[in-house]
Amino acid sequence: MDGRRRAVARTAAAAFGGTARVARYHDADASHAVDLLACSDGDADGLTSYSTVTLHTAENRLDGQDIRVELAAVAPTAAERFANALATGALNVMKDGWLAAPGVVFRGLLAADGVTHDLPHVLWVEPVTWPQLGTVEVPDGPAVHWLQAIPISESERRFLAAEGFFAIERRLEEQRVAFWDLSRPSTV
């Protein structure tokens, strides 16, 4: 990893706490790869915090601006396929130009990787668990903005489409959703 990527990894590891490790994930034909940091025992027993640490090298265009991002999440350590799903989302941004921004949903991401069928989609939000990762200046390049994955149900996705991002965000906050609980009931 070059210095910029190391700085991104160190920043995420410091925010997460716990024991850190980095693994590389490739797409099916090994033409693209993303490095993913996993930190265990930092947030709570039985949970692992994840962050991509090399996605910021890929363009992410929002309203004509290139907003560099990393994707983060918290999930039960026992959900072994969760890291793969997060890496798949990052590879979709890198390879296929998917937009990663607050309010955007990656449909079916968790179901496709066999993580959960109850909450198959990922809603991207500002990093509520780690506010210090909102916007981070790192050496030799543009600022990096972290987004946090919130697993959502199909009915929550439809509610978001009908009522808007702020309505679903408010609903999730009011009901104090444990966003790391991959078997939680839907709020809608």
Please tell me what each predicted stretch does.
Residues 1-68, 72-188:
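Acidic, proline/glycine-rich low-complexity IDRs
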